Regions:
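Loop/turn-to-beta-strand initiation segments
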Residues: 185, 213-214, 250-253, 282-288
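Walker A/P-loop nucleotide-binding motif
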Residues: 183-200
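Short, charge/polar-rich alpha-helical segments
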Residues: 2-14, 18-44
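Pre-Walker A (pre-P-loop) alpha-helix and adjacent loop at the N terminus of AAA/AAA+ ATPase modules
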Residues: 139, 143-187
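Short glycine-rich substrate-engagement loop in P-loop NTPases that contacts/grips substrate
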Residues: 153-169, 187, 209-250, 266
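Short, charged low-complexity linear segments at domain edges
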Residues: 69-104
Length: 331
């Protein structure tokens, strides 16, 4: 699983801040106890000192360290018993002064072996939702709130009615999100504006990110401007753009919205092919939303890209009346 560096930094920062807050709360608890019973502070200091004595005895040359270590151990145990007695007199459990990690799996380091611990993964998922919420209304949008009633049930000359087609798209998107694995599938959502493409994209982003995968959502126009900045600039803007390009290339799921609304140039054609082909080769998944049908995409971006889309993406056409306009007209 790939982690978004930007999101991981934010998650780690919050993780460390919460850890420091807990440590400060523990320090304050200790100070309150020491004010009630100064002897406890002295005992704590002596217990910490015995650890240094054991190390010094073990390193001392020319003598057998075991007898000295046994004496120090007995002293340490005696101090612990006295500490427990004093704490009990004050009404506290015997481990009240000990720093207890919130996560028993990693000891609050956030890592287990070479990977993230589940505790840090929770922070990562929360930060990713926050990052996606800056561009998508994922808080209120879910597969369960997708309203099929706005789509006509009349087939006319179509093999499916707009409502049947919307139901099919909903089922496919829900299944894509529920069974998501990087590189398993790619989706191309295409059709006129206002038919639910961005809504379903947001639903996919929400479910996949909550499952712990890295998700980047962006508009095609902004992505291509970042590609251009990374290629031609050498200032701070170029550095930031380069990081954004890496995020788009390496995330588990890229959701590329509004493809076709940008100014299409030869550079954009090249950047789009590089992005999509690179992600396919790396085993990463992509969801594309566009107002253009496959034939129009081929004319605008070239036959090689169209071949990639038709061969590697599941095509989901959206048909019907502009739902945003219908909602406005009905007040």
């Amino acid at each position: 699983m790939a982690y978004d560096g930007k999101v991981l930094r934010q998650a780690t920062l919050r993780f460390d801040e919460d850890k420091q807050r807990r440590q400060e709360q523990q320090r304050q608890r200790q100070q309150r106890v020491y004010q009630q019973c100064p002897e406890l502070e002295s005992i704590q200091r002596e217990i910490r000192g015995t650890m240094g004595e054991i190390i010094a005895s073990a390193l001392r040359r020319g003598t057998d360290p075991l007898p000295a270590i046994r004496v120090i151990r007995d002293k340490n145990l005696s101090l612990q018993r006295r500490r427990a007695e004093l704490l009990a007199q004050l009404g506290y459990p015997e481990d009240y002064l000990s720093e207890k990690p919130r996560c028993p799996l990693c000891g609050d380091t956030g890592y287990r072996g070479d990977g993230l611990c589940s505790c840090l993964k929770k922070y990562y998922a929360q930060e990713q939702i926050r990052e996606l919420s800056r561009m998508l209304d994922i808080g209120s949008q879910s597969f369960d709130t997708f309203e099929l009633d706005w789509y006509s049930p009349d087939r006319g000359s179509l093999p499916r009615s707009p409502r049947e087609n919307a139901q099919r798209n909903l089922n496919l998107c829900r299944d894509f999100a529920a069974r998501f694995r990087p590189g398993r599938e790619n989706l191309l959502l295409f059709g006129a504006p206002g038919l639910g493409k961005t809504f379903l994209s947001a639903c996919i982003a929400r479910v996949v990110s909550e499952d712990g995968f890295s998700v980047v959502y962006d508009t095609a126009g902004h992505v291509f401007s970042q590609f251009e900045s990374a290629k031609f600039r050498r200032d701070d803007d170029g550095d930031t753009a380069g990081e954004d390009v890496e995020r788009c290339m390496n995330c588990d799921l890229l959701i590329l919205d509004d493809l076709g609304t940008e100014m299409t140039t030869s550079f954009v054609q090249s950047a789009l092919y590089q992005l999509l082909n690179g992600r396919l080769l790396a085993g990463k998944s992509t969801v594309i939303s566009t107002n253009l049908d496959p034939e129009e995409l081929g004319r605008r971006y070239g036959a090689p890209l169209l071949s990639r889309l038709e061969g590697e993406y599941q095509l989901l056409p959206f048909v019907g009346m502009d739902i945003r306009r219908l909602k406005r007209e009905q007040g």
